């Protein structure tokens, strides 16, 4: 056949003939199907067929005339001309020989699947589409559940006409593509019955930070167009590549989306071949993929990335669409294309750490809305709410676009915006891809944004605070911090990072670092669990109906309270451990005080009213107590899951506020019973050296544990007898006090005697350069810092070590 190529005949060398999308499907058919990756079969109508059609009745010359002198920024003119061109294409009949070939290929495909008329997806594939430096995200149309020759011909024509929507013309013009040097091929692919299963998009790289070792998967019930088009908030999953390839099960994040609707087949004879129906409560409260499905998809992503990288002779992260057949249970890859944002960063750019931050971080800001952050920038300006494309020309340069959902038709408008906010959408929808590509901060899935905000309102949009994006009332000044990482000198003293929020881990891992010196378990409980641990252990007692309902809503998607707690904690710790892998990540077990636990959901039923919570029921004393030990055993299970199931053996454990040797033995026994034993699979167990007794009896504690991390905050408080929360005596609280320096020195010397680890994770090194200098001179193993202190402290330590070496004074 002259104008038809079956997928098995194609590969990536055929882009000019069948476009990027079809060439890529052919490539997978030839190279990846043989190794077990499933791809639905089909055929491509070549770009030669497109030119053949335009030759009929002088259509090509008429298109040239209509596009002459069109300015892509003149939206009204663009709309009129694009409509005229599409009508021209629709009015041009297919030559009979071309139509006959299409019908013959469709019959062959139908017979292959033992069907009279196969249900197919009809997808556009532009010859300039899906190239590494341009996503063409959604620029041409896709139609699902097309059945029969009449429908097939109609929707193929619709695809060809979609090459001349106003958005597609604008996009090509902005990228310097000649309109009549970009041709369109059409792919016809057997449908996967995802209407009875689920579908979505995955990336073989983290889309926001460029972290290379994670697969990011989005998923929803039904056909995948709702995920791609951003009309729902999908489920999200992250899988860690290195340990997945070691046959571990490293699902390091699960996030339940609301999935309010799903796209299914419409009855035959309907106006449209698909329709959206509401999901049931059970569907939106359940994950749309099982863990097994998530791991299969991640393995597919790794193999696809490896193949395309090998072919390109360079690292090539991929953007992949997938579908799960609800009848057979099989998972199929339906498209794969190069990722177009993170992969295009130059080597020089990757050597620069760039961070957007507020000029006055301590200034109080009112959060009015939040959603999923796209990018890592900050934008501010006046709101412009636009509910439909007809009013797009009212949008002014520098305004903040607020709408229900930005599909690629909005691209000319998005280019002018200082930020974008949508009611609906996930991080892999077309709008998110385009926002990243043009470098505009966007927050998607902000429920009720168009109702809560109003045109003319001044707001600030921040995507610089992790995966959650925040909308603040008012304008707040921001600045950009840029650091040349290539200029950083290596240090002997290890520089670690303190981290409490797993969502920031991928970004923080790009700072110069040797690992994580303090990952705070209690912050993960606070932000991920939100309920008091004992309120989960004891779900059916001591609670109001309201509290019980709130807890059950938090648990949606998980089998029971224990499953929720253990997996959520493991995901948080896993995310941090994966971000810094294989560098050490020291996780401190929970260290909330009774007054802090009391403020959590359901907490008032389980906590005593203490006169002095700072010195009361906290740290190790909780772990073996009759009232709390079951909750602590769940914590231990989560830690064991990270090491054993996820394979993240770089994670180490640290026990806080350990008062006596006897307590130490009790805690070690609980850890052992939960498969956490020093030396087993490289595990090290440290304690916080934060009580004077830890220093006084350092040799005894170090006979039980693998090292110390000095907690300078509590150690200063308890050595100087100062309540660190009291303003009245705050002037006395000073880690530079001579007594404190002696405490630090004794702790370091004890660890050296036992040849064991000694770090510091308190606030002192972040605040006082002279404390850092003292610790380096004493030969401390590591200094763990808040992220904003890492770069200046690193440079100071490197300079100091150089001076010490020159004078022969180094302690290392």
Curated annotation (Swiss-Prot):
UniProt binding sites for Mg(2+): 690, 714
Domain of life where this protein originates: Bacteria
Record-annotated active site: 430, 761
Residues the record lists as binding substrate: 520, 588, 690, 711-714
Pathway: Carbohydrate biosynthesis; gluconeogenesis
Reactions the enzyme catalyzes: pyruvate + ATP + H2O = phosphoenolpyruvate + AMP + phosphate + 2 H(+)
An example Gene Ontology biological process: gluconeogenesis
Cofactor: Mg(2+)
Annotated keywords: ATP-binding, Kinase, Magnesium, Metal-binding, Nucleotide-binding, Transferase
InterPro entries assigned to the protein according to its UniProt record, in alphabetical order: ATP_grasp_subdomain_1 (IPR013815), PEP-util_enz_mobile_dom (IPR008279), PEP_synth (IPR006319), PEP_util_AS (IPR018274), PEP_util_C (IPR000121), PEP_util_CS (IPR023151), Phosphohistidine_dom_sf (IPR036637), PPDK_AMP/ATP-bd (IPR002192)
Function: Catalyzes the phosphorylation of pyruvate to phosphoenolpyruvate.
Miscellaneous remark of the record: The reaction takes place in three steps, mediated by a phosphocarrier histidine residue located on the surface of the central domain. The two first partial reactions are catalyzed at an active site located on the N-terminal domain, and the third partial reaction is catalyzed at an active site located on the C-terminal domain. For catalytic turnover, the central domain swivels from the concave surface of the N-terminal domain to that of the C-terminal domain.
Protein name: Phosphoenolpyruvate synthase
The organism's taxonomic lineage, starting at the top: Bacteria, Pseudomonadati, Campylobacterota, Epsilonproteobacteria, Campylobacterales
Gene: ppsA
């Amino acid at each position: 056949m002259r104008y038809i190529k079956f997928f098995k005949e194609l590969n990536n060398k055929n882009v000019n003939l069948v476009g990027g999308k079809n060439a890529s499907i052919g490539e997978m058919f030839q190279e990846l199907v043989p190794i077990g990756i499933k791809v639905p079969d089909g055929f491509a109508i070549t770009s030669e067929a497109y030119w053949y059609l335009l030759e009929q009745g002088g259509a090509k010359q008429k298109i040239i005339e209509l596009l002459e002198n069109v300015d892509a920024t003149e939206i009204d003119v663009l709309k009129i001309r694009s409509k005229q061109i599409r009508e021209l294409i629709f009015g041009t009949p297919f030559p009979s020989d071309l139509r006959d070939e299409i019908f013959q290929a469709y019959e062959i495909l139908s017979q292959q699947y033992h069907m009279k008329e196969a249900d197919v997806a009809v997808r556009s594939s532009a010859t300039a589409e899906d190239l590494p430096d341009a996503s063409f995200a959604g620029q041409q149309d896709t139609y699902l559940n097309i059945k029969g020759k009449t429908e097939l011909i109609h929707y193929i024509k619709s695809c060809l006409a979609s090459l001349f929507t106003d958005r597609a013309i604008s996009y090509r013009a902005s990228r310097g593509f000649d309109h009549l040097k970009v041709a369109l091929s059409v792919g016809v692919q057997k449908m996967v019955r995802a209407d009875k299963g689920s579908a979505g998009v995955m990336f073989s790289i983290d889309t926001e930070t460029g972290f290379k070792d994670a697969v990011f998967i989005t998923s929803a019930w039904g056909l995948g167009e709702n995920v791609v088009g951003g009309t729902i908030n999908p489920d999200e999953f992250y899988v860690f590549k290195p340990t997945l390839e070691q046959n571990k099960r490293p699902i390091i994040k699960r996030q339940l989306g609301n999935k309010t609707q799903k796209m299914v087949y419409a009855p035959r004879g309907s106006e449209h071949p698909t329709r959206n129906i509401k999901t049931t409560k059970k569907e939106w409260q359940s994950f749309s993929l099982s863990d097994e499905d998530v791991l299969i998809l991640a393995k597919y992503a790794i193999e696809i990335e490896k193949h395309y990288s090998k072919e390109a002779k360079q690292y090539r992260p991929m953007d992949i669409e997938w579908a799960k057949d609800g009848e057979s249970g099989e998972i199929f890859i339906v498209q794969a294309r190069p990722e177009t944002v993170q992969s295009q960063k130059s080597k020089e750019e990757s050597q620069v750490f760039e961070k957007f931050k507020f000029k006055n971080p301590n200034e109080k800001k009112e959060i009015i809305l939040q959603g999923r952050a796209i990018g890592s920038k900050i934008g501010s300006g006046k709101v412009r709410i636009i509910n439909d494309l007809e009013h797009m020309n009212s949008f002014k340069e520098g305004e903040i676009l607020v709408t229900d959902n930005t599909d690629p038709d909005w691209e000319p408008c998005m280019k002018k915006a200082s930020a974008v906010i949508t009611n609906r959408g996930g991080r892999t929808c077309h709008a998110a891809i385009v926002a990243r590509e043009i470098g505009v901060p966007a927050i998607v899935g902000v429920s009720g944004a168009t109702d809560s905000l109003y045109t003319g309102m001044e707001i600030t949009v921040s995507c610089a605070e992790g995966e959650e994006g925040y909308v603040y009332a008012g304008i707040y000044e921001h600045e950009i911090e840029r650091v040349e990482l290539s200029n950083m000198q290596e240090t002997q003293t290890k520089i670690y990072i303190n981290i409490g929020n797993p969502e920031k881990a991928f970004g923080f891992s790009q700072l110069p670092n040797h690992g994580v010196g303090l990952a705070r378990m209690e912050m993960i409980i606070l932000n991920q669990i939100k309920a008091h641990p004992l309120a989960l252990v004891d779900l059916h007692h001591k609670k109001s109906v309201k509290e019980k309902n709130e807890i059950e809503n938090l648990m949606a998607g998980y089998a029971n309270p224990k499953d929720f707690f253990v997996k959520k904690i493991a995901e948080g710790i896993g995310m941090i451990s994966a971000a810094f892998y294989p560098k050490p990540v020291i996780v401190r077990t929970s260290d909330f005080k009774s007054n802090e636990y009391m403020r959590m959901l359901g907490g008032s039923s389980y906590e005593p009213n203490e006169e002095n919570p700072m010195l009361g029921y906290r740290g190790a004393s909780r772990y073996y107590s009759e009232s709390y030990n079951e909750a602590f055993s769940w914590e231990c299970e989560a830690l064991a899951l990270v090491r054993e199931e996820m394979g993240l053996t770089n994670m180490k454990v640290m026990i806080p506020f350990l008062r006596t040797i006897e307590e130490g033995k009790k805690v070690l026994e609980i850890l052992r019973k939960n498969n956490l034993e020093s030396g087993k699979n490289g595990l090290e167990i440290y304690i916080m050296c934060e009580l004077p007794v830890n220093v006084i009896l350092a040799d005894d504690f170090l006979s039980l544990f693998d090292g110390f991390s000095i907690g300078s905050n509590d150690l200063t408080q308890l050595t100087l007898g100062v309540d660190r929360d009291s303003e009245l005596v705050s002037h006395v609280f000073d880690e530079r006090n001579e007594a404190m320096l002696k405490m630090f020195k004794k702790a370091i010397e004890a660890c050296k005697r036992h040849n064991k680890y000694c770090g510091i994770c308190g606030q002192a090194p972040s605040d006082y350069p002279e404390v850092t200098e003292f610790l380096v001179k004493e030969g401390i193993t590591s200094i763990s810092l808040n992220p904003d202190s890492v770069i200046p402290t690193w440079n100071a330590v490197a300079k100091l070590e150089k001076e010490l070496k020159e004078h022969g004074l180094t302690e290392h």
